[in-house]
């Protein structure tokens, strides 16, 4: 069975409550349940983890290399400045897809740049929570050798 890690960064524990006009009304618990069910339809075991702490996310990325076939990662605001997360991603062979619920390129100027994107396998932005589903499918394609 293929195993993926879903990482959500700072403030994503506030999904459904924080700026629903931008991030929607789906809570993190609802999203994780939906994605776990969706992944299982493709014989993918999905493990979900959220932290507001950079170091905890780095530890999960390092650990993932020996445990998971791919990572779906919404780094939240760390996207724009965390060189530590960038280095963690660059240090592993496991493919990472960066996901953002909103279109970071159409928001405030400070959100336009991702320091992580150059070391990820891809980036999905602006498609709401559906972006996570697309990331699961894209990663599955990559690990099965179809997306190379």
Swiss-Prot record:
Pathway the protein takes part in: Metabolic intermediate biosynthesis; chorismate biosynthesis; chorismate from D-erythrose 4-phosphate and phosphoenolpyruvate: step 3/7
Any Gene Ontology biological process: chorismate biosynthetic process
Annotated site residue numbers, Transition state stabilizer: 18
Residues at the active site: 23 (proton acceptor), 100 (proton donor)
Enzyme class: lyase
Enzyme Commission number(s): 4.2.1.10
Molecular function terms, GO-annotated: 3-dehydroquinate dehydratase activity
Biological function: Catalyzes a trans-dehydration via an enolate intermediate.
Family to which this protein belongs: Belongs to the type-II 3-dehydroquinase family.
Protein name: 3-dehydroquinate dehydratase
